């Protein structure tokens, strides 16, 4: 009997919104990662198991073949670079946007017009660098791993680049969204070698995910 396929998922919104896609393929994950201590979760399909990893690590597990396929946000994939990955499907889940935000009262447009050099805090350094370079905005990028909203409040940065969903966290911290960089959603990523060697085993899942994603994007 061949080894089961391995699907890499991260906890939280991506996991929660992938569950219905798995259900469309007739598969249920046996345990909830929010309550289970296990990092390898069986499913109702003996040919599929789920590993629970950090969102930023999903592309790495898939690239190196530790997982055959996974679900990762466009934001994570842009920072990773996408090497060694096949990205067949935009799943239309975990949708939000990547934006620039500043403290309320800070005249961002004028600062840009004046050619000011801005300090920008973000975990998305590569994407932010490309965005500001394309607009001719001079920035010093400060890499942080969380609590972006704090950086402008304590004088660490003039602005942040972060993911925005409802905007509630920005508002609660007296920040305003001044520029949308791009819409973000999560994508299915597949190890390129697995796609060749395990195509028959992967195909039912890829087909089910594609059908379900078309429905969720409607």
From Swiss-Prot:
Homology family: Belongs to the ATP phosphoribosyltransferase family. Short subfamily.
Entry keywords, A to Z: Amino-acid biosynthesis, ATP-binding, Cytoplasm, Glycosyltransferase, Histidine biosynthesis, Nucleotide-binding, Transferase
Entries under HAMAP family matching the protein: HisG_Short
GO terms classed as biological process: L-histidine biosynthetic process
The reaction(s) this protein catalyses: 1-(5-phospho-beta-D-ribosyl)-ATP + diphosphate = 5-phospho-alpha-D-ribose 1-diphosphate + ATP
Record's protein name: ATP phosphoribosyltransferase
The protein's Enzyme Commission number: 2.4.2.17
Enzyme superclass (EC): transferase
Transmembrane parts of this sequence: none
Described function: Catalyzes the condensation of ATP and 5-phosphoribose 1-diphosphate to form N'-(5'-phosphoribosyl)-ATP (PR-ATP). Has a crucial role in the pathway because the rate of histidine biosynthesis seems to be controlled primarily by regulation of HisG enzymatic activity.
Free-text note regarding domains: Lacks the C-terminal regulatory region which is replaced by HisZ.
GO CC annotation, single: cytoplasm
Subcellular location: Cytoplasm
Assembly description: Heteromultimer composed of HisG and HisZ subunits.
Record pathway: Amino-acid biosynthesis; L-histidine biosynthesis; L-histidine from 5-phospho-alpha-D-ribose 1-diphosphate: step 1/9
A GO molecular-function descriptor: ATP binding
CDD domains from the UniProt entry: PBP2_HisGs
InterPro entries the UniProt entry points to: ATP_PRibTrfase_cat (IPR013820), ATP_PRibTrfase_CS (IPR018198), ATP_PRibTrfase_HisG (IPR001348), ATP_PRibTrfase_HisG_short (IPR024893)
SUPFAM superfamilies reported in the protein's UniProt record: Periplasmic binding protein-like II
NCBIfam families cross-referenced by the UniProt entry: hisG
Lineage of producing organism: Bacteria, Pseudomonadati, Pseudomonadota, Betaproteobacteria, Burkholderiales
Domain of life (superkingdom): Bacteria
